[in-house]
């Protein structure tokens, strides 16, 4: 069994459960993904499926990639990712993998690119409390002391300081699948997942 799929975050909404509880969910377009390469222990040292997601114009694909995609049907893809697989022999080149890989109630890990926030201060970037907001205070959102001049006479590596925040890959774990709509390849996941709307996400089974 393939252990994951590529998808695109559509956005967030809310639905009601059978018990009448309002549940915030993230809607993800999961696939359809096409198997573009099959990796085995004998040939590559490990087992995996290379999946292609979102078709791309042939004029936008370079010749090496076009030759690679030709082996799986000739259709080019904008995104290619590898997913672990239990038995590679159960799959063939060009085979389609969709949202039916998962089931409602299953827990998954979702990885994506965090929203980029640019250069940010310590209050926004690290959650510092900030200084006092009283009369006479001139340091409301500054980090404070980062070391003395006598000792250590330097700033230690890893010190929480202002800097570029976001635009990094993060994984949100143990999210529950609320519902699956196979006819539209939509997966409704309880809670929030990383990234902005239309951003690429990877949905993996636990222990993948």
Swiss-Prot record:
GO molecular function, one term: rRNA binding
GO biological process: translation
InterPro entries (UniProt xref): Ribosomal_uL3, Ribosomal_uL3_bac/org-type, Transl_B-barrel_sf
One Pfam family this sequence matches: Ribosomal_L3
Alphabetic keyword roster: Ribonucleoprotein, Ribosomal protein, RNA-binding, rRNA-binding
RNA-binding recorded as keyword: yes
Transport as UniProt keyword: no
A GO cellular component annotation in the UniProt record: cytosolic large ribosomal subunit
Superkingdom field: Bacteria
Positions in coiled-coil regions: none
Homology family: Belongs to the universal ribosomal protein uL3 family.
Function: One of the primary rRNA binding proteins, it binds directly near the 3'-end of the 23S rRNA, where it nucleates assembly of the 50S subunit.
Oligomer and partners: Part of the 50S ribosomal subunit. Forms a cluster with proteins L14 and L19.
Classification via PANTHER family: 50S RIBOSOMAL PROTEIN L3, LARGE RIBOSOMAL SUBUNIT PROTEIN UL3C
Identification of the protein by name: Large ribosomal subunit protein uL3
């Amino acid at each position: 069994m393939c252990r994951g799929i590529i998808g695109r975050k559509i956005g967030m909404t809310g639905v009601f459960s059978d018990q009448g509880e309002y549940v915030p969910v993230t809607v993800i377009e999961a696939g359809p993904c096409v198997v573009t390469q099959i990796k085995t222990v004998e040939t590559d040292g490990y087992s995996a499926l290379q999946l292609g997601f979102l078709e791309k114009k042939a004029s936008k694909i370079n010749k090496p990639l076009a030759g690679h995609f030709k082996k799986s049907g000739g259709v080019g893809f904008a995104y290619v990712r590898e997913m672990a697989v239990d038995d590679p022999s159960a799959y063939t080149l060009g085979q389609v993998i969709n949202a039916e890989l998962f089931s409602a109630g299953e827990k998954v890990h979702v990885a994506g690119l965090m929203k980029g926030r640019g250069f940010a201060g310590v209050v926004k970037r690290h959650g510092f409390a900030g200084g006092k907001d009283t009369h006479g205070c001139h340091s409301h959102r500054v980090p404070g002391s980062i070391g003395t001049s006598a000792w250590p006479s330097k700033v230690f590596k890893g010190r929480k300081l202002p800097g570029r925040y976001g635009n990094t890959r993060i994984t949100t774990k143990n999210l529950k699948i609320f519902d699956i709509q196979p006819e539209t390849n939509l997966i409704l996941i309880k809670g929030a997942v990383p990234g902005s709307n239309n951003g690429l996400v990877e949905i993996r089974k636990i222990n993948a």
